[in-house]
Structure formats: structure tokens, C-alpha cells
Amino acid sequence: MGAAGYGALGVAFALVSYLLVTVDLGLDPFAVQRVARDPAGLPSLLPQVVKLRLAASLGAYALLGVLTSILPSQVVGGKELALIYGGRLFSAALKANWALRGRDEMGQVAAGMLLQNLLYAAGIFALVRCPEPSAIRVPILFMAGEAVLVLWYLGRLKAAYPRLWGAPAQNGIAATLLRDSLPVAASKTLRLGFHEGDLLLLAWLSTAAQAGFFLVGHRIVTALASVALLFQQSAFPSLSRLSEDRVGRSLDFQRSVSRGILLCFMPPIVTGAVLGDPLVRLLFGEEFAPAGAILSISLAAVPLLALSAGLHNCLLARGRPRAVLAATGAGTLVHLLLGLAWIPDSGGLGAARALVCGEAVVLVLSSLLVWKRWRVLAVDAATLWILAASGLMAAILWQSEGIWLGWRLLLGLGAYLAAVLFSGALRPHELRRLLEG
């Protein structure tokens, strides 16, 4: 397919992702919170959420049809690709991962995602070995994985609730959730500007090939960020219950979660940032070599995103969705302005720089809002030590260029672990102590 074909797939996917917010409606945090506090009420809640989202998905798909008819092909990435990816609007309405999260069954959520990705990867593996691989088959394979994921989630819930769809509805639940969730839906729409928005800007202000380079460079970033956010999401039900008690305790819990995420994720982030160019050449081939620099820059956004997501969990659990909207909106505005300034000249590199700057603004403002409301620092000394240890690892990897790669990685990782252990930032029993308390 080449960089241009890869970029067309990414642009079509990005367009559908924007419409996906009109189906999601920002309901997940509040639905998760309700299930975490009252698991027995799930059979009454699930049908209302699904019906509301299915109605929204019909309108969103109709809008997608209009957009693919009136917008230039480089903006939509191809009408057929966008319309097939549009099936996500319906699978999103049926996905019940939020119900499993509320029941603290993150293992089932992760297992479903793993199954989906394995099936998708197997399909792509078979596709690239076809004599003439067609781009149109990629969204078809993706939607097959989505269907499996929907059935997996509903099957897990059906096993726990035999009368999942037969419970009497409680009037007003969906309306109450929808009213509370609108700021979250707006925040999610703005948040899409940090990846999907970049792809659309690149397709508009640059070329499909540049969008393809950005998508390849951002593929590893997205994988790491998705797992980090999955850990943050798994903590939200417990955080919701803790938030009914003392505020300080819930904030301590969230800082511990964020610190654990950084502790595990900083070594691969640093390694990818330093070795981005050879890593992209190895995984995607010489044709996508320009994506190496994009990967190196974009990886800096992962720890920023992980920390800000933790702060947003605290704000949402305490009923402050408008604070999340304010921080996300400001970061998105900075990101958009920088993207408009840098993308025409620098392409994917400009988009990557704008992405990191926007994420930094979101984190700073979120930290200030948490401090203003509760007078609690969002980042503690142990977290700063982890970041400092990451800087030491990066310096060793850079300075040891020329020796065998295995020794470079061992030296860098050894220095990182030594610095973390020396600082006392490694606290393996802290999360368990907080949960038991």
C-alpha cells in the first residue's frame, strides 16, 4: 500500500473516531462509577445505555455518509474506507466494557482486547502475503475484530447476570447520566485532536504520505499509551469508592497508580525515543524511515498523558468534569495553533512537536486545578525521581552509541533500576496497603 495508502487508512479511521464521540456521549466514567457503587443495578442500566447509544449511532452514520459525499477525498481518506470503518459507530454502542470495569473485571476487558488484536494481527499477516493486498480489506478485518470484542463482553456479562436484558428499567437513569456526561463528551472530542486531528491536519496541510509517516511513528506511541490508560481505567472504580471517603486518601491512591505506570513504562519509552530510527526501519522497512524521528519525539507524550489521565480520574470521581474540559480545551487549542504553524513546513515532525506541547499544557493545567481545589501536589518526589532516572538511562543510551546494542540496553536499564532503588521510589506494597485501608 505504501505510505500514501497507509495514510489514507489513518485519515478514514480518524474521521470516524471524531463521530464516535457522538455515540460514546462521555457516559463511561459515570456508568462505571454507578456500577462500582451498585453492581446489582447493572441489568437495569445496561439496556438504557445501549439503546441511547444505538440511537446516536444511527444519526452519526448518516452524518458520515453526508461528509464522505461532500468533503474532498484527501480529507476523508476514501469514501469506501470511511463507510466500512463507520461500523465502529454501532460496535461502540454495543460494547459493554464499561460494565466489566465497574465490576473490577479488568482481566476480562484485557482478555477481550487481546483476542481482538490477535485476530486482527493474524488477518493483516495473511493480507500482506497476498499477491495484491487491498486496502479495503483492512477495515473489514478491523470490524471483524470489533464484532468478536462485542460478543466477548456481552458473553461475560450474560454469565454473571442470567437475566441481563429482562430487568425492569429505572426511569431517569440515562437522562441523569447524559446530563452529567456532556462535559466529558466535549473533552473526548477535544482529546481526539491529539492524534486523529493531527492526521486530518496532515491530510489537509501536507500529504497523505506525511500522514502515513505520522501514523507509523505514532503506532508504538498509541500502543504504549493505550496500555497505560487501561491501567488508569482499571483504577477508576476503586478511586470512585475511595472518593466517597477522604479526598486525601483517594489522591494518594491515584498518585501511587500513576507512579507505578511510569515505573514500568519509562524504560521502553526511553529506549524507543533514543532508538526510534532503527526501530522503525526494523519493523516497517526503509520506506517508512522518516517515521523514526516522529516516533522519538511523540514518545515524550506518553508519560504526560498517563499523568494527566490520573488527575482527570480524580477530578471526575469528585464530580469535576468541567475542570477536565477546561484543561483539555486549553491544551487542544495550543496543540491546534502549533500544528497549523508547524505542519505545512515540517509535516509529521511538526505534528509530533505540537502533540507533545499540547499534552504538556494539559498536564500543567490539570495539576494547577487539583492544587487549587485540594491543595495537593499532583506529582510527588518519588515520581520526580523516576523521571530523573529515566533521564539518566537516556543519557547512557546516547553516550554509549557504538557498542553492542545489548550492552547499551543493559547499562541503561541497570542505571535506571539503581537510581529508582536508591531513591526509594519503588514501593511494591503501597497500592495494596491503600486498597486494604
Predicted regions and their residues:
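Signature of the first transmembrane helix
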Residues: 1-28, 61, 65, 120-121, ...
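Membrane-proximal transmembrane or re-entrant/amphipathic helices at the cytosolic face
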Residues: 395-437
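Helix-loop interface residues and adjacent transmembrane-helix termini in multi-pass membrane transporters
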Residues: 3, 102-103, 130-132, 205-208, ...
